[in-house]
Amino acid sequence: MKREHNHRESSAGEGGSSSMTTVIKEEAAGVDELLVVLGYKVRSSDMADVAHKLEQLEMVLGDGISNLSDETVHYNPSDLSGWVESMLSDLDPTRIQEKPDSEYDLRAIPGSAVYPRDEHVTRRSKRTRIESELSSTRSVVVLDSQETGVRLVHALLACAEAVQQNNLKLADALVKHVGLLASSQAGAMRKVATYFAEGLARRIYRIYPRDDVALSSFSDTLQIHFYESCPYLKFAHFTANQAILEVFATAEKVHVIDLGLNHGLQWPALIQALALRPNGPPDFRLTGIGYSLTDIQEVGWKLGQLASTIGVNFEFKSIALNNLSDLKPEMLDIRPGLESVAVNSVFELHRLLAHPGSIDKFLSTIKSIRPDIMTVVEQEANHNGTVFLDRFTESLHYYSSLFDSLEGPPSQDRVMSELFLGRQILNLVACEGEDRVERHETLNQWRNRFGLGGFKPVSIGSNAYKQASMLLALYAGADGYNVEENEGCLLLGWQTRPLIATSAWRINRVE
């Protein structure tokens, strides 16, 4: 702790006289003479208030002073009341100083203890609120992370509501308050709040995040880290592959159309499974769709090397598109009657919802090629409503669960995974119109869309459910994950909240 004392040292010749004069002057001014001798200026009338603040400070420092910043500067400690107040403010960032020019009293944001408390906070929270014997309205020190956490959530929601009402002045004040409250939190809550606060700030100040083709390779790289750090993508690939393998069980030629190839992480496992088929491996054709033709071709070459090594005949076709709605049937080179066709989409279809009519056009294209199965993995969330505050609230709960599931020992994969999810949050909160591409919908909403598009559901099956559950049991932190079967679809969730859903579809031939 750094303290800067603004005392001026008097010369030796006048030191004694000066000290006595000071005591007399201070006593005449009603300042307590005993504290003056110790170098502190405290009026007798302020003694009760100072005693109250000192009691608060003693409580705060009860567990040590390790939480004080090394860069803290306390000015003029001879002003005991002001010095203690500054100490309390530094220790507790939730204490908001009232400014004469401030139009909004942000201290009114409510809160109550609902978040899990750690052992350190439990010890301190017993002495969190101290009531003065002289007044029941004295300020209190709120250091309990539970209380601050609830205040943080209320501040985020209040800011989102101000944005919805286009009250940008209030929103500006609230988003700054959110940053202050978030700084006192730790773990997943702090990270989630920081991303949502940044999204709100970008929306308020109109500094929108980019989501263009130039950044697609970076997003693909982040997705690799997300794949490594948690089971969500592994679950998506495994369950989709199981559904595809059931359809390909006896086919001699098979064709997979991947709507978002990225780094091709899904297909080595499928190629190996086809190689082990009792009746021998089929000829395997893969059509990979993505943004960069060069990147797609490189992934195809690597998969071809793997297939050759394990004895699977492999053919690859690359297609570069900026939007899946631009896909045409003739691009896919379908060979009717000669091959079994599967279409695969992992976290791709929701992006089509940013462009009116695109999803209907796309489903019409897929229907025209008559695949034997279409596997779809999407976020289990409703982030595509018309009311901003509703979307914000739903996404805050959704990503809080996701970030909570990522908590663990620090690693590069975890940090990059958080950035991967953070970019989604920024797009969801800050952007509108065609720029807002993170438009997640629930499984029931996708059921309605596919039903109207001429598709019917295919049950993924209990075998995939059992194997997915076994896969999760081997994963670190598996106790928090759960697999749920819902009308032939499989959902993976954290604690009690479903987070992603895998479904399978085929053409409804009776329409």
UniProtKB/Swiss-Prot annotation:
Positions of short motif LXXLL motif: 349-353
Region (Leucine repeat I (LRI)): 150-204
Motif LEXLE motif: chain residues: 54-58
Motif DELLA motif, residue range(s) on this chain: 32-36
Region span, SAW: 430-506
Span of domain GRAS: 143-506
VHYNP motif (motif): residue ranges: 73-77
Functional description taken from the UniProt entry: Probable transcriptional regulator that acts as a repressor of the gibberellin (GA) signaling pathway. No effect of the BOI proteins on its stability. Probably acts by participating in large multiprotein complexes that repress transcription of GA-inducible genes. Has overlapping but distinct roles in GA signaling compared to RGA and GAI. Regulates the floral development. May also participate in seed germination and in ovule and anther development. Its activity is probably regulated by other phytohormones such as auxin and ethylene.
Name the record gives this protein: DELLA protein RGL1
Organism: Arabidopsis thaliana (Mouse-ear cress)
